[in-house]
């Protein structure tokens, strides 16, 4: 697959303006990225602007804390799909995971998967807040809940993806679930490390820099 198709071109800052959203949409169309990932308030606009494009619209649910109620996450998902979202990146209930309330975590994910009605669901487990066993368990619950991807990070918790965590997640979920690496993927070197570790989607605000690095690379 072309490397550009691995990238969710991302802008999730709370102060994001319409001008900045326009910029990432234009960049995504120019570089043929897989999607633009924007906050729910921008989904309808992005979907309208990308209607004549292969670029998908990705949005975030229960973001960035994961601490919304399950019903709220399900409604957010339904609303996002209605507004034109193609893909949903949700945040798990991190506290419930740490409590050992695994049924609650799985049911939370399942509610979003159901609300997404067949659209791609990626589950953010916020690896920087988890230990090894918690990363494994969160990945297992993601798979059991029927989601499509397990994702490392929101980028809002003080850390992002590491190749070690990506490999652990991939080893845990196997072939049935994909892994998205996000948070701190800023250049071609970072991108390559994540892909080599098993990521098949990269969430990054630095998609253009990554592609420029690829273009400069003799193997491109």
UniProtKB/Swiss-Prot annotation:
<dbReference type="Pfam" id="PF01791">
    <property type="entry name" value="DeoC"/>
</dbReference>
<dbReference type="GO" id="GO:0006018">
    <property type="term" value="P:2-deoxyribose 1-phosphate catabolic process"/>
</dbReference>
<dbReference type="GO" id="GO:0016052">
    <property type="term" value="P:carbohydrate catabolic process"/>
</dbReference>
<keyword id="KW-0963">Cytoplasm</keyword>
<dbReference type="InterPro" id="IPR028581">
    <property type="entry name" value="DeoC_typeI"/>
</dbReference>
<protein>
    <recommendedName>
        <fullName>Deoxyribose-phosphate aldolase 2</fullName>
        <ecNumber>4.1.2.4</ecNumber>
    </recommendedName>
</protein>
<dbReference type="InterPro" id="IPR011343">
    <property type="entry name" value="DeoC"/>
</dbReference>
<dbReference type="InterPro" id="IPR002915">
    <property type="entry name" value="DeoC/FbaB/LacD_aldolase"/>
</dbReference>
<feature type="active site" description="Proton donor/acceptor">
    <location>
        <position position="180"/>
    </location>
</feature>
<keyword id="KW-0704">Schiff base</keyword>
<comment type="function">
    <text>Catalyzes a reversible aldol reaction between acetaldehyde and D-glyceraldehyde 3-phosphate to generate 2-deoxy-D-ribose 5-phosphate.</text>
</comment>
<dbReference type="InterPro" id="IPR013785">
    <property type="entry name" value="Aldolase_TIM"/>
</dbReference>
<comment type="pathway">
    <text>Carbohydrate degradation; 2-deoxy-D-ribose 1-phosphate degradation; D-glyceraldehyde 3-phosphate and acetaldehyde from 2-deoxy-alpha-D-ribose 1-phosphate: step 2/2.</text>
</comment>
<comment type="similarity">
    <text>Belongs to the DeoC/FbaB aldolase family. DeoC type 1 subfamily.</text>
</comment>
<dbReference type="GO" id="GO:0009264">
    <property type="term" value="P:deoxyribonucleotide catabolic process"/>
</dbReference>
<feature type="active site" description="Schiff-base intermediate with acetaldehyde">
    <location>
        <position position="151"/>
    </location>
</feature>
<feature type="active site" description="Proton donor/acceptor">
    <location>
        <position position="89"/>
    </location>
</feature>
<dbReference type="GO" id="GO:0004139">
    <property type="term" value="F:deoxyribose-phosphate aldolase activity"/>
</dbReference>
<keyword id="KW-0456">Lyase</keyword>
<dbReference type="GO" id="GO:0005737">
    <property type="term" value="C:cytoplasm"/>
</dbReference>
């Amino acid at each position: 697959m072309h490397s550009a198709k691995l990238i969710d071109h991302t802008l999730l800052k709370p102060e994001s303006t319409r001008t900045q959203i326009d910029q990432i949409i234009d960049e995504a169309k120019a570089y043929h990225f897989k999607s633009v990932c924007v906050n729910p308030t921008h989904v309808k606009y992005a979907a309208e602007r990308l209607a004549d494009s292969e670029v998908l619209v990705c949005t975030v649910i229960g973001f960035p804390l994961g601490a919304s109620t399950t019903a709220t996450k399900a409604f957010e998902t339904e609303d996002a799909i209605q507004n034109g979202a193609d893909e949903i990146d949700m945040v798990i209930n991190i506290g419930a995971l740490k409590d050992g309330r695994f049924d609650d975590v799985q049911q939370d994910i399942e509610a979003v998967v159901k609300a997404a009605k067949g659209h791609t669901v990626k589950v953010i487990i916020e690896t920087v807040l988890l230990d090894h066993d918690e990363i494994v368990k969160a990945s297992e619950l993601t798979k059991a809940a029927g989601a499509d991807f397990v994702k490392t990070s929101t980028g809002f918790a003080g850390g992002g993806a590491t190749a070690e965590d990506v490999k652990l997640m991939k080893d845990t979920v196997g072939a049935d679930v994909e892994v998205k690496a996000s948070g701190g993927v800023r250049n071609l070197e970072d991108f390559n490390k994540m892909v080599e570790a098993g990521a098949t989607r990269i969430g990054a605000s630095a998609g253009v820099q990554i592609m420029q690095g690829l273009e400069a690379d003799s193997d491109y």
